[in-house]
Amino acid sequence: MLRTFMHAKLHKARVTEANLHYVGSITIDEDLLDAVGILENEKVQVTNNQNGARIETYAIKGARGSGVICLNGAAARHFQIGDEVIIMAYAQLTNEEIATHVPKVAVLDQENSIKQMLSQEIAHTIL
C-alpha cells in the first residue's frame, strides 16, 4: 500500500509576481526548488495565508537567486504580490519508506531567502 506524505515545503514564501496571461503553473526560484527537492513539472499545492485559497499546479524553474514566486494563469486571480504562501509537494511512500522518510522544509524570510531548514515540524510551532 502507498500512503501520501509531504516531502517538501517552502514555508512563508512571498508572492513576487502574478501573471494572469501565462499558460499556467507557479514559477519558483531554482535555488529554492533545489533546497527542498521539488523538481520542475512536479505537482505542488499552494496555500495563501492571506485569503485561504488553495490550489494545485506544477512547478517551473525561475532564475536562480531571484527569489521569484510567480503564480501564473488562472491562479493569479487568487494570489497577489506580497501574499504569504506555503508551497508543498507530496510523495507516495511504501510502509518501508515511511520509516525513514524525512521531509525538507525551508522557512523563508521576506525576500524569499532561506532563513531556516527543518527536518520535522513540531505541533503548535509558530514561526
Curated annotation (Swiss-Prot):
What does the record note about the cofactor? Answer: Binds 1 pyruvoyl group covalently per subunit.
GO CC terms on record? cytosol
> Which reactions fall under this protein's catalytic activity?
L-aspartate + H(+) = beta-alanine + CO2
Which CDD domains does the record associate with it? Answer: Asp_decarbox
Q: What is its EC number?
A: 4.1.1.11
InterPro entries (UniProt xref):
Asp_de-COase-like_dom_sf, Asp_decarbox
Which compartments is it annotated to reside in?
Cytoplasm
Residue positions annotated to bind substrate are: T57, G73, A74, A75
The task this protein performs is described as: Catalyzes the pyruvoyl-dependent decarboxylation of aspartate to produce beta-alanine.
Oligomeric form and interacting partners: Heterooctamer of four alpha and four beta subunits.
**What is the protein's name according to its record?**
Aspartate 1-decarboxylase
